[in-house]
Regions:
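Conserved catalytic-core motifs of eukaryotic protein kinase domains, centered on the activation segment
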Residues: 18-21, 43-44
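Residues that scaffold the ATP/ADP-binding catalytic core of kinase and kinase-like folds
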Residues: 17-18, 124
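Conserved beta-loop-beta element that borders a ligand/cofactor-binding pocket
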Residues: 1-17
């Protein structure tokens, strides 16, 4: 359309700073910091591939600069992990008890595995994620520890009130 040089990027689950607190990793961090239950769907055996947000940004930049027009690039983190293992890792990093983990009824149609094959971007553009999951999760936890006001305003309802004021009844 409009003769624009378009490439497509598809990615696995991102994590890192500013990750909205409704998602698995930030939700578990915020709840653990507040000693609230850590709700895990089903038995927690659903698998996700995790990609640190800065690695995803680097991949997008590389695709924009060096990608071929009309190509599709899958950007994956090589970090396939079960949700329960992610939650236990967060609990460990925060020095909290696994007793906070609460198993809840799984969502209908919940994907058992969500991951993509990033072989093409590795082969064609030489991209590989630079952040090891263990390092990325620690940076993410540190960010949430140092930016409580940001995420606490969101989970307190202040964000929802702002959103309704700005966009409600329009």
């Amino acid at each position: 359309t409009y003769k624009l040089p378009i490439s497509i990027s598809r990615c696995s689950n991102n994590y890192g700073p500013y990750h909205f607190p409704e998602k698995l990793i930030p939700l578990m961090i915020a709840n653990a910091l507040n000693d609230k239950p850590l709700p895990v769907y089903g038995e927690g055996i659903n698998v996700r591939d995790w990609l640190y947000v800065e690695d995803h940004c680097a991949a997008i930049d590389l695709i924009i600069r060096n990608g071929k027009e009309a190509e599709v690039y899958n950007v994956g983190g090589h970090n396939e992990m079960r949700n329960i293992d992610i939650v236990k890792l967060i609990v460990k990093h925060l020095g909290k008890s696994e007793d906070l983990i609460t198993f809840v009824t799984d969502r209908a149609g919940h994907d058992m595995r969500y991951a993509i094959d990033p072989t093409k971007i590795h082969h064609d553009l030489g991209w590989l994620p630079q952040t090891k999951f263990e390092d990325g999760i620690q940076k993410t936890i540190d960010w949430y520890l140092n930016n409580r006001e940001w995420w606490e305003n969101i989970i307190s309802g202040e964000y929802q009130q702002y959103y309704e004021k700005m966009y409600g009844n329009r």
